[in-house]
Structure formats: C-alpha cells, structure tokens
C-alpha cells in the first residue's frame, strides 16, 4: 500500500513537471517571436518644429547678443566613416561659440554636411591654419602665399566663419631670419584678415606684431 502511494505521488509529480515545462516552453516561444522595430533617428526639427525653432533662436540670442564667457574648442576632424557618434563634429555641445577644425586640410564629406548644422546653432566653425606645424614645408613667401590662398578658398567654398592660425616666434637667429619670420606673420595676418571673417591666434603672441 505504501509503495502504491509513493508510485502515485511520483506519477503526479512527473505530470506536473511536464505540464509546467510545456507552459514555460510555450511562453519562451511567444517571447522570442521576431518583431520589427523602427530605429529611424529623427532630427529634433522633425519631431517638434516649433520647439526646435525656439531653441535655435535662444542659442542665437545668447551667443550673439548677450554678454557671456566665450567657449572655444578644437576638434580632431577628418576621421574616416565611424560608428562612434563622438567622431563627428555634429556631436559637439550646442553651447560652443567657436570650434576650430584641427585637420582643416582633410575636411571629409561628413564634416561638410555637419558644418551648417553647427552654424544653425550659432557655433562658428574655423579653419585651422597651422603654420607652426607646416612652416618647414613653406620655405618662402610664394609657397606660404599659395598655401594661404588654398585655405581662404576652402573657407569661402564651405562658408566657414573664419580662421585660427598658429605660429612660433624666432627667439634667436640672424637679422635676416628674424625679418623673414616677421614677414611670414604679416603675410598670414594680411591674407586671412582680408576676408573680413573671424581671426583667432593660437600660440605665443610675440609671433605677431601689434601693428599687424
């Protein structure tokens, strides 16, 4: 009698486990049914055009009309197509007043597409004229002038907002070398300022004479 009771209990337990397992299996199948998800990224102006327009206007008023501390950054642009959003200039904070494209001689298609987006938010985008890095490759004023003309042409074509340039003063050397370095600085300032666009210097200010 005792053995029959144990056998009945065992059968009942097995039936219960089978039924429960079947339910769980069915539930899992329901959960793993494929479902199409829309991952289309909408621009804020498409989600709420009125709110977006008000936000853009508030940025313009703040940056161009109200006294505030200027925020300035340099961005290492020119990265090949990347899955990392942080590699694109469109990922920069809206609060920036100026951003210099560090690799301005390698402005990619993505950079070209993103520049107007930054400008819409009143962020001014500058071309980097890195004379401190390139001066060894520019032995005379003719070579320097041609290089500067290319920068001016690019800024005009892409409707950028100006230039940031760098230079290193000559602390020693002969009078001729000193004069050549000063002439280079004058040519840079003259060419870039003639555009009427923003002009920022990065480096030791003694590279540029106050009169220039």
Language-model features and meaning:
Residues 66-212:
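Chitinase-like catalytic core of GlcNAc-active glycosidases
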